[in-house]
Amino acid sequence: MDASIVSSSTAFPYQDSLNQSIEDEERDVHNSSHELNLIDCIDDTTSIVNESTTSTEQKLFSCNYCQRTFYSSQALGGHQNAHKRERTLAKRGQRMAASASAFGHPYGFSPLPFHGQYNNHRSLGIQAHSISHKLSSYNGFGGHYGQINWSRLPFDQQPAIGKFPSMDNFHHHHHQMMMMAPSVNSRSNNIDSPSNTGRVLEGSPTLEQWHGDKGLLLSTSHHEEQQKLDLSLKL
């Protein structure tokens, strides 16, 4: 039996060589398949990297106003809302500036300086009625007629805006004008006379010294006129 097997194996030696060649071919095919798998794996990794880069490039969002880039649409939306708030504030400031330049200062003048000035007069010992009822005259051409200061109420007692002054104040001013009428007429008559054409007021405020063609003329003092005015007002 064993002798027959040996004889058969020796009788077909070419069959063994054929089997060996087939095994070698199968081994080569298997090795080549492994090499192809490695190449495919490298290609897969490169494709994955390329896809990741393209995905990151697609996720970048840029702002149209300042060209800043953001990685999410939510961040870009908040940034654009901040730009909108800035624009609305800028427009509001421009409208306020335009209205202020067109209509002037909306609050007008403050009454505090006038009130403080009135208090300063009180601190210096000057009374309000002596200021309001004081009668003044100025030097120069036309000063011969005198100038009447209307009596002015203190700042705290002035009527509010939109209210007319009372009739008592109107009668008081009218009475004051009627009492001053004779003195004004007498001064106008003295001016018309040719002897008093070149008079100049000089000296102290209580003594008026007039120079004319006929010599020195002394007029009544300012103090006496003030006393007459006070007496007339008391009546």
UniProtKB/Swiss-Prot annotation:
BP-aspect Gene Ontology terms: abscisic acid-activated signaling pathway; negative regulation of abscisic acid-activated signaling pathway; regulation of DNA-templated transcription
Residues in C2H2-type zinc fingers run 61-83
Which UniProt keywords are listed?
A: Abscisic acid signaling pathway, Metal-binding, Nucleus, Zinc, Zinc-finger
Annotated GO MF terms: DNA-binding transcription factor activity; transcription cis-regulatory region binding; zinc ion binding
- Describe what upregulates or represses it: Down-regulated by abscisic acid (ABA).
According to its UniProt entry, what is the function of this protein? Acts as a negative regulator of abscisic acid (ABA) signaling during germination and early seedling development. Involved in the regulation of vegetative development and fertility. Modulates red light signaling in seedling photomorphogenesis.
Record-given protein name: Zinc finger protein 3
* Organism expressing this protein natively: Arabidopsis thaliana (Mouse-ear cress)
Q: What is the lineage of its organism?
A: Eukaryota, Viridiplantae, Streptophyta, Embryophyta, Tracheophyta
* Gene field: ZFP3
